[in-house]
């Protein structure tokens, strides 16, 4: 009896030291992680330590080669890692989304000073353009989007940002935006700039500026877009789109076409994009 009792006590002791295993289910069969101070998924640890706001963003960073474990590049978001492992990012994202990189590149290229400007961000989404403008010193941004709940929390709680969700930019007028708007930035999808710019320009003060992202897949005809399954690769089509927008903005809207620059990064589907600078005079 004494032997059996000792064995039972030893088994209980061992059981208490076995870490609990949690799994996320059949859809992610390999996403099990150990929770009692032992190993976890890399993407989960990145979120736990505050590197990223969600596992999805952490996954993208790992797949893009931005995460280092003990000075070695990580390649798998689901890799099991000690919670105390030495983790580093090759380059911290300066903005809440990739869109900020596009606008920042354009403002730098055009040497456009937005300090103290009153701005409107049409198609704000997560807020990459808004974040870029705030970091460059604008006094206020109206973050406008037809969707809801997408704007990053740090922008949503910034007193320089006026959040205007569930708002269609095509229906805006000066009653919606108190104050004088000096600058409008545009990053809209599934709609041509030819539909967005007319009401936007009406909001601008004289000598106000527009910086708009040109997305060829939403400017080309349906036939051209369907050919490449939504990706426009033909440089001749790019030229036609830019020429058509130049003609529309200068002749129909009476704007001054100040310049155009290619985006430093591709769109999500691999589309080449451009940013145009327009001035109201």
Annotate each predicted stretch with a short phrase:
Residues 116-123:
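Conserved class I S-adenosyl-L-methionine
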Residues 32-85, 118:
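A basic, amphipathic helix-loop patch mediating RNA/tRNA/ribosome contacts
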Residues 216-234:
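Short, glycine-/aromatic-enriched active-site segment of Class I SAM-dependent methyltransferases
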Residues 198-206:
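A short glycine-rich, Lys/Arg-flanked "PGG" loop and its adjoining helix->strand segment in the class I
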Residues 265-281:
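Core SAM-dependent methyltransferase catalytic element
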Residues 207-214:
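Conserved beta-strand signature within the Rossmann-like core of class I S-adenosyl-L-methionine
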Residues 148-179:
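S-adenosyl-L-methionine
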Residues 135-140:
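Conserved S-adenosyl-L-methionine
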């Amino acid at each position: 009896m004494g032997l059996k009792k000792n064995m039972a006590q030893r088994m209980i002791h061992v059981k208490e030291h076995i870490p609990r295993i949690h799994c996320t289910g059949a859809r992610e069969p390999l996403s099990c992680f150990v929770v009692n101070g032992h190993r976890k998924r890399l993407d989960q640890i990145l979120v736990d330590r505050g590197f990223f706001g969600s596992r999805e963003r952490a996954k993208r960073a790992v797949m893009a080669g931005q995460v280092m474990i003990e000075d070695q590049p990580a390649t798998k978001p689901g890799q099991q890692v000690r919670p105390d492992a030495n983790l580093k990012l090759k380059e911290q994202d300066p903005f809440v989304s990739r869109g900020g990189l596009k606008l920042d590149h354009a403002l730098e290229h055009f040497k456009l000073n937005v300090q103290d400007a009153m701005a409107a961000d049409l198609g704000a989404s997560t807020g990459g353009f808004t974040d870029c403008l705030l970091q460059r010193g604008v006094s206020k941004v109206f973050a406008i989007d037809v969707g809801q709940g997408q704007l990053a929390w740090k922008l949503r709680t910034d007193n320089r940002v006026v959040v205007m969700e569930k708002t269609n930019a095509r229906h805006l007028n000066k009653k919606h935006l108190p104050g004088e708007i000096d600058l409008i930035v545009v990053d809209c999808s599934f709609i041509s700039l030819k539909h967005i710019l007319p009401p936007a320009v009406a909001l601008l003060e004289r000598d106000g500026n527009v910086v708009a992202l040109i997305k060829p897949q939403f400017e080309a005809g349906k036939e051209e877009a369907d050919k490449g399954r939504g990706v426009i690769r033909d440089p001749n089509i790019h030229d036609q789109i830019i020429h058509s927008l130049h003609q529309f903005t200068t002749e129909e809207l009476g704007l001054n076409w100040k310049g155009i620059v290619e985006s430093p990064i591709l769109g999500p589907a691999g589309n080449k994009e451009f940013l145009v600078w327009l001035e109201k005079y």
